[in-house]
Amino acid sequence: MRVTVLVGGVGGAHFLLGVQQLLGLGQFGPQQCPDTLTTGHELTAVVNIGDDAWIHGLRVCPDLDTCMYTLGDGIDPQRGWGHRDETWHAKEELARYGVQPDWFELGDRDLATHLVRTQMLNAGYRLSQITTALCDRWQPGARLVPASDDRCETHVVITDPINDSRRAIHFQEWWVRYRAQVPTHSFAYVGAEKASAATEAVAAIADADVILVAPSNPVVSIGAILAIPGIRGALRTTTAPVVGYSPIIDGKPLRGMADKCLTVIGVQSTATAVGQHYGARRTTGILDCWLVHEDDHAEIEGVAVRSIPLLMSSPKTTADMVNIGLQLAGVSA
C-alpha cells in the first residue's frame, strides 16, 4: 500500500512514527534491507517548506530536518528538534563575534546538514534531490519530499514592539524570537505565486492509495503546503481518499501555537472549524474523512467524521488512530 502524508515538523514527525509502526516500516520494520521489499508498503511524506530560511548563509529546512532526524532515530528527545548529543561551539563563537541573528540556535552537528544542503543548492541540485541524498545518511524508512523545490516562505505581518509600526518578518523570527507574543495581523506565503509543487510531491499524491493530513498546524504547516500551486489541485483530483486528523483537542492545539495562528486568520480553535477550513473534497475542499478527539464533536457536510482518542502519546497509540482513519476511508493496511 502506498501512503502519502502531508506533515509539518515536530507533531508531523511523531505522526509519521505512528504510520511507520502500523505499516512495519523504519524503526518498526525489518532491518538491513529496503522496507518496501519486505512489507509491501511505501510511505511518502510531503513536508512543509514554509519554515525554511537562510541563517548565517546556510539554507535551513526545519521541518524536513525534524522529520529526517526523528525517523532516523537521531532527534534530540528533550528539545524535540536538532541532533541528539549536540554541541554548541559554533554558536558560542558566533555570539563572541556579535553575529545576528542570535535568537536562532544551530548546533555543531546540525550545521553539517545545512552545509551539505547549501553546497548542493549552489551546485544546482533541487531540494528534492538534496533531501534524498541527506536521507541516505539517516535511513528514515520513508521518502521525505519537500512540497516544492522553489523558495516559498511563511512571513508574518506584526506590529513592531519597539516602534509600533507594522512590518513583515520571517515566520522563524515570529515563532522563535517572539514566541508569537506580538500583535499579529496576517500571514503571507512569500514566493507562492511563482512556485510550483515538486514533481515528486505531485506524483506521491497522484499515485497514493490513501492520503493522510497530519494534525500539524493548519495555518503555517498544512496551510503553507496547500498554498503552493499544484498541491491542492493534486489532492482534489487524486483517486485516493484524503483523511485528515484534527490538531485541536477541546479547543486547544495538540502542540505549538496553532490556536494563535487560527485566530489571526479568523478561524475558531475547534475541530469543526478547522475541518470546515479544509473543506470537503466533494465541494471545493480537500477532505473525505475527518478524525476528531473523542471528547469533541464535528459535523462537516460531505465529510465522514469520527471521534476517537487523538493524543499521540506513543507510536502505538498513534498507529491505532491512523488505522481507524484508514478504516473510515475503506482502506486496509
Curated annotation (Swiss-Prot):
Positions contributing to 7,8-didemethyl-8-hydroxy-5-deazariboflavin binding: D65
Gene Ontology terms for molecular function: LPPG:FO 2-phospho-L-lactate transferase activity; magnesium ion binding
CC cofactor: Mg(2+)
GO BP: F420-0 metabolic process
EC number: 2.7.8.28
Keywords annotated in UniProt: Magnesium, Transferase
Catalytic activity: enolpyruvoyl-2-diphospho-5'-guanosine + 7,8-didemethyl-8-hydroxy-5-deazariboflavin = dehydro coenzyme F420-0 + GMP + H(+)
Pathway: Cofactor biosynthesis; coenzyme F420 biosynthesis
Family: Belongs to the CofD family.
Binding partners and assembly: Homodimer.
Job description of the protein: Catalyzes the transfer of the phosphoenolpyruvate moiety from enoylpyruvoyl-2-diphospho-5'-guanosine (EPPG) to 7,8-didemethyl-8-hydroxy-5-deazariboflavin (FO) with the formation of dehydro coenzyme F420-0 and GMP.
Protein's recorded name: Phosphoenolpyruvate transferase
Organism of this sequence: Mycobacterium leprae (strain TN)
Biological classification of the source: Bacteria, Bacillati, Actinomycetota, Actinomycetes, Mycobacteriales
